[in-house]
Swiss-Prot record:
DNA-binding region: 55-61
Species per Swiss-Prot/TrEMBL record: Salmonella typhi
Quaternary data: Homotetramer.
Record bears the keyword DNA-binding: yes
Record's GO cellular component terms: nucleoid
Keyword terms, alphabetized: DNA-binding
UniProt key word DNA-binding: yes
Region forming the signal peptide: none
Any one GO molecular-function label of the UniProt entry: single-stranded DNA binding
Stretches for region Disordered: 111-161
Full protein name: Single-stranded DNA-binding protein 2
Entry's Gene Ontology BP terms: DNA replication
Pfam families: SSB
Length: 178
């Protein structure tokens, strides 16, 4: 019995250009991304820092394609899980051409990293477009609240006064004062 292989690609990189969106005859969206990943190392002989950038062709289909076309821009950092696919076509002069792409279908993943407004801006941004600034020292005696990096600011009123036991409540801290 022949065993199945594994075809899974995971990339974290930055877009080299805005997403290119097309629509299939059935109305489904298709987006092409040009994704750069970089490796850095130190040359053992010279001690110089070296960097190599690889460019990856990424294709997204369906709802992920629509989201990518709306929110991603040149410079956006993105996490991709997909599969390698090689396709063949014939160009206008009759020459057969091949290209290998990372295809992200319904079983794949595309996750935006670095916040909504981080792409293309000259200023380093924190999650959700908030500039990173050191926290002001707290003098209240209470421990400072910890906010994970990619969460929106807590500037809205909470209508839910409690959460049932057994449910995790992200972004909330419970203090018992006696």
């Amino acid at each position: 019995m022949a065993s199945k292989g594994v075809n899974k690609v995971i990339l974290v990189g930055n877009l080299g250009q805005d997403p290119e969106v097309r629509y299939m005859p059935n109305g489904g969206a298709v987006v092409n991304l040009s994704l750069a990943t970089s490796d850095t190392w130190t040359d053992k002989q010279t001690g110089d820092k070296k960097e190599r950038t690889e460019w990856h062709r990424v294709v997204l289909y369906g709802k992920l394609a629509e989201i990518a076309s709306e929110y991603l821009r040149k410079g956006s950092q993105v996490y991709i899980e997909g599969a390698l696919r090689t396709r063949k076509w014939t160009d206008q002069s009759g020459v057969e051409k091949y290209t290998t792409e990372v295809v992200v279908s319904q079983s794949g993943t595309m996750q935006m990293l670095g916040g909504r407004n981080s792409a293309g801006s000259g200023q380093q941004q924190g999650g959700w477009g908030q500039p990173q600034q050191p926290a002001a020292p707290s003098h209240s005696g209470m421990p400072p609240q910890q906010h994970p990096a990619n969460e929106p600011p807590m500037d809205f009123d909470d209508d839910i006064p409690f959460a049932p036991f057994g449910h995790s409540v992200a972004r909330h801290a419970l203090y018992v004062l006696s």
